[in-house]
C-alpha cells in the first residue's frame, strides 16, 4: 500500500508543467512557498492536483481528525456606520427601524437560554452602532463572565474594536487590555475582507485598513489571546490580491504565533451593492481552500464555515485541506443568510455534525475554542449524542 507522500509523488510525476512540479516537491519537503508560487497554484494547478497536495498537508498536520465545537452566536445589532459594498446585513443609523438593537438584558437572556447546555463558546459580532460604545460592551463582557465564567467569549472584529477605541480615545493597547480584563478571551477573524488597498478602497474604504486590522490582532496576541483570520473571496479581487492577503497573515503569524485558524469566506451577492457580480463556482471554492492550506504553512487549522457554503460543500472541503467544520451555530447568525447563503436557518445538532464528518471518512473531535479536545466522537453511537 502506498503512503500518502508516495501517492502525491506519483501524482506530481504526471504534472508536465515544470513550475508546478517544483512547487509540488517543495510542498512535499515542507518548504515555504513564495508569493509568485502561490499565484501559480491558483492559475495553473488542476483541482485534483491541488486537492491531493492540500490533503497531504492536512493529513500530515492532523491525520483524519476534523474538529467542531458547540457554540452559539450573538449579533448585538445590524445598525452600522459603515457602508461596505458586499454587505447585505447592515442598516444605516437613519434606517435603524429596519434593523435590530439588542440591549445587554436581551443579550443576557440569550446567554441564559443556554444554561445547562454543553456549549463552550459564544461568538459575538455585529454592526458598528454609533451608540453602542466601549463601556456598553465592557459591561456585556463582565455580565457574561459573572453569569457563566466557563464560557469562552470570542468577540468583536477589529472593525468594531477600532471604532470603539477611537470613540473612547484609547490606544489599541489600552483598549485591548480593558476588553481582556473584562472577559474577552479571543478574537474572531472577521473584518479582514481583502487587505490590498486597491481592492479595499473599492469595497470597504471607510473602515479600518489592513495595518489597523493586523495591529489589533498583534496586540491581542501580545496579551496572550488567540485569534482567527478570514479572507473574503470571489468578488472583484485577483489571485495576487488573495496571496498578498495571506502573505501578510503569514508574516504576522511568524511574528506572534497567535492565529489558530484561517477561514476563507465566500462572497454572496444577494441584496447588496455588488449583486451584479456572479458568485464563485464550487471548483473555485475548493481551489481557494486548497491553496490556503498550501500557502499558510504556519497556520494550524483551516476552517470551512458551513452556514455560508452549505453542508455538502463544506463536507467536500475536507478533501481540500480543511480540518475544522466550525460549530453547531444553533440558527443564531444572520450575517450570511441575509446575503443568500446556502443555509437560511443555520443549525446542526451535534449528531448531525458528527455524521457529516464521519461520512467523509474523517474522525470527529469536539474541541474548545483553543482546540483543546472536549470529546472524541469516532465511536460514539449517534443516537446517544445530546443535541
Please state what every model-predicted region is.
Residues 153-155, 176-195, 223, 255-266, ...:
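Non-cysteine beta-strand/loop elements that form the S-adenosyl-L-methionine
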Residues 70-72, 95, 125-135, 197, ...:
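Glycine-rich, proline-tolerant flexible connector loops at the mouths of alpha/beta enzymes
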Residues 30, 54, 84, 124, ...:
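Conserved, mostly hydrophobic/aromatic
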Amino acid at each position: 500500500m502506498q503512503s500518502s507522500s508516495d501517492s502525491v509523488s506519483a501524482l506530481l510525476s504526471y504534472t508536465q508543467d515544470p513550475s508546478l512540479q517544483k512547487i509540488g516537491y517543495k510542498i512535499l519537503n515542507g518548504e515555504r512557498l513564495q508569493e509568485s508560487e502561490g499565484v501559480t497554484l491558483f492559475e495553473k494547478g488542476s483541482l485534483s492536483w491541488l486537492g491531493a497536495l492540500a490533503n497531504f498537508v492536512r493529513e500530515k498536520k492532523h491525520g483524519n481528525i476534523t474538529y467542531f465545537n458547540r457554540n452559539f452566536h450573538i449579533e448585538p445589532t445590524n445598525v452600522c456606520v459603515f457602508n461596505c459594498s458586499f454587505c447585505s446585513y447592515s442598516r444605516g443609523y437613519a434606517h435603524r427601524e429596519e434593523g435590530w438593537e439588542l440591549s445587554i438584558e436581551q443579550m443576557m437572556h440569550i446567554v441564559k437560554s443556554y444554561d445547562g447546555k454543553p456549549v463552550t463558546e459564544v461568538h459575538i459580532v455585529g454592526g458598528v452602532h454609533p451608540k453602542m460604545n466601549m463601556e456598553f460592551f465592557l459591561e456585556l463582557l463582565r455580565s457574561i463572565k459573572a453569569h457563566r465564567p466557563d464560557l469562552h467569549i470570542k468577540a468583536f472584529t477589529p472593525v468594531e474594536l477600532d471604532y470603539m477605541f477611537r470613540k473612547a480615545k484609547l490606544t489599541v493597547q489600552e483598549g485591548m487590555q480593558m476588553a481582556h480584563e473584562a472577559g474577552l478571551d479571543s478574537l474572531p477573524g472577521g473584518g479582514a475582507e481583502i487587505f490590498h488597498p486597491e481592492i479595499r478602497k473599492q469595497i470597504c474604504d471607510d473602515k479600518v485598513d489592513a495595518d489597523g486590522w493586523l495591529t489589533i490582532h498583534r496586540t491581542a496576541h501580545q496579551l496572550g489571546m488567540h485569534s482567527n483570520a478570514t479572507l473574503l473571496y470571489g468578488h472583484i479581487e485577483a489571485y495576487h490580491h488573495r496571496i498578498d492577503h495571506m502573505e501578510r497573515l503569514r508574516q504576522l503569524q511568524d511574528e506572534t504565533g497567535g492565529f489558530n485558524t484561517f477561514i476563507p469566506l465566500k462572497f454572496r451577492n444577494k441584496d447588496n451593492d455588488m449583486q451584479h457580480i456572479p458568485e464563485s463556482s464550487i471548483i473555485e471554492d475548493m481551489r481557494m481552500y486548497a491553496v490556503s492550506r498550501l500557502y499558510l504553512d504556519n497556520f494550524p487549522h483551516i476552517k470551512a464555515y458551513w452556514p455560508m457554503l452549505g453542508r455538502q460543500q463544506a463536507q467536500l472541503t475536507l478533501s481540500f485541506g480543511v480540518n475544522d467544520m466550525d460549530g453547531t451555530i444553533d440558527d443564531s447568525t444572520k450575517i450570511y443568510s441575509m446575503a443568500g447563503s446556502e443555509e437560511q436557518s443555520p443549525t446542526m445538532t451535534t449528531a448531525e455534525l458528527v455524521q457529516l464528518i464521519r461520512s467523509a471518512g474523517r474522525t470527529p473531535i469536539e474541541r474548545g475554542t483553543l482546540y483543546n479536545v472536549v470529546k472524541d466522537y469516532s465511536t460514539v453511537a449517534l443516537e446517544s449524542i445530546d443535541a
